[in-house]
Amino acid sequence: MLTKRTDNVEHHKGQVSLPGGAIDKNETAQNASLRETKEEIGIDSSSLKSLGQLSSLYTPVSYFNIHVFLWYSETQPQIKINDSEVDQVYKISLDELIDNNLVLNTPINKSGFKINVPAYHFNECICWGATAMIITELKDIINES
């Protein structure tokens, strides 16, 4: 599940991302992942099962060290968007994720400049940057299985 961030958030305005945010004091990265998922899209942690963790990565633009956790739900979770943080939710099927290839020269607008970046083009959204890197690692793990 991917989200499009609103223009109200401090970092990565209008970009497609995974639910997430800063780790609170005395909180684990895994607990922050669950809390942010609940805050942003309303999915309660009691319905989620852990599938593990991907590699952490650093984003120099926002100075975040991103910790990626994979969660699974046996039932279709009810989505409740926090419209101050999330503009839209995109449900990407596993088949669509696996079948999608990275497009190397995708033009995007970044801070008033048009640049070309590697990105995934899903039916409803384009993922680039850290989100594309996370998707690439997940696809590699799935393809190795």
Predicted features by range, described:
Residues 1-18:
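N-terminal strand-loop-strand
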